[in-house]
Regions:
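Long, contiguous internal "core" modules enriched in hydrophobic/ aromatic residues
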Residues: 70-248
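Membrane-helix interface "capping/anchor" motifs
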Residues: 248-256
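Single conserved hydrophobic/aromatic residue that forms the stacking wall/gate
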Residues: 264-274
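Membrane-helix interfacial "entry" motifs
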Residues: 7-11, 15, 44-48, 80-84, ...
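Membrane-interface helix-loop junction between the first two transmembrane segments
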Residues: 1-15, 147, 155
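Central hydrophobic cores of alpha-helical transmembrane segments
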Residues: 257-263
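Bacterial Type III/flagellar export signals at protein N-termini
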Residues: 14-20, 274
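Membrane-interface helix-loop-helix modules in multi-pass inner-membrane proteins
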Residues: 20-93, 112, 195-198, 224-225
Length: 275
């Protein structure tokens, strides 16, 4: 509802994602299935501890298939505007929730296992909405907004392209500020990280009850000190966003979209601290 100012422009925006949205949404299901196959304990803990958050994502995603299919069924401005906002909710809420979830994972989520390895989440829903997790949600939302803006800038022209470029550049600036701010918060804000202190046997069966970790505010930087090349990962995240913003301003939209994809990949790297 922001890039397209009238029904025709909004129809153009919808048409740019129409051939791809359902395939992209399948990746959410594939990701959940892959987590269940690879790390069933992680799947059980995440989907139980983040139960209400997952439901919010699911409810938001309901708007997408219905909105794409039913928006044009009735030639009524109120009807179409309602579904435009529904599509906006379906696109904006999931990245925000996923960012908040990753922010909580970085800080640690309170849960425990019983003797049968059944996990129990001991926190509350409102504890998940802590300041650092919300900042991670801002990073995620800005990153996805920038990605969408780059895509629209490449696939459209005229006034829609101009608004998409402005939105993408603004989202890039917000993402860089929030991303760097989160790093400074980890460095100087006293947020503790985790270090695995127990021995790791690659040939042994996984047993979370046999592992121990220690919390330390310095834990975030252990791997960076041991492997200085890891600093390239956050640097590439910032550089990719800035390069994409510069390229899209120069109307090199395809190059900007590629740079944006590379920056997105670098931001997903999170080295594990092991001692």
């Amino acid at each position: 509802p922001f890039v397209g100012r009238n029904d025709v422009e909004r129809r153009v925006v919808i048409n740019t994602v129409g051939p791809h949205w359902d395939g992209n949404q399948v990746w959410f299901i594939t990701g959940g299935g892959a987590i269940f196959a690879a790390w069933p304990l992680v799947y059980a803990t995440a989907f139980s501890g983040f139960y209400w958050a997952m439901l919010v994502v699911l409810w938001a995603l309901f708007f997408r298939p219905v909105g794409f299919d039913y928006r044009s069924k009735i030639h009524n401005a109120t009807w179409r505007s309602t579904w435009d906002w529904g599509l906006f909710i379906g696109g904006a809420v999931p990245p925000l929730i996923f960012g908040v979830a990753f922010g909580n994972l970085l800080q640690g989520v309170p849960f425990g296992f019983d003797d049968y390895l059944i996990s129990t989440y001991t926190g509350t829903f409102w504890q998940l909405l802590n300041p650092f997790a919300l900042l991670a949600g801002v990073v995620s939302s800005a990153m996805i907004t920038m990605h969408g803006g780059m895509y629209l800038a490449h696939r459209t022209e005229g006034a829609i392209q101009q608004r998409a470029i402005r939105g993408a550049v603004g989202a890039a600036a917000l993402m860089v500020l929030a991303f760097v701010g989160a790093g400074l918060w980890l460095k100087f804000g006293g947020i503790e990280g985790f270090v695995i202190t127990s021995a790791i046997d690659p040939g042994a069966l996984p047993d979370p009850l046999a592992k121990t970790v220690a919390r330390s505010a310095d834990a975030w930087w252990l791997n960076y000190r041991a492997q200085p090349l890891l600093w390239l990962l956050p640097a590439l995240g910032v550089a990719g966003a800035l390069a994409a913003a510069a390229l899209v301003l120069a109307r090199r939209t395809l190059s900007a979209f590629v740079a944006r994809s590379e920056e997105h990949t670098s931001e997903l790297q999170s080295p594990l601290n092991i001692s």
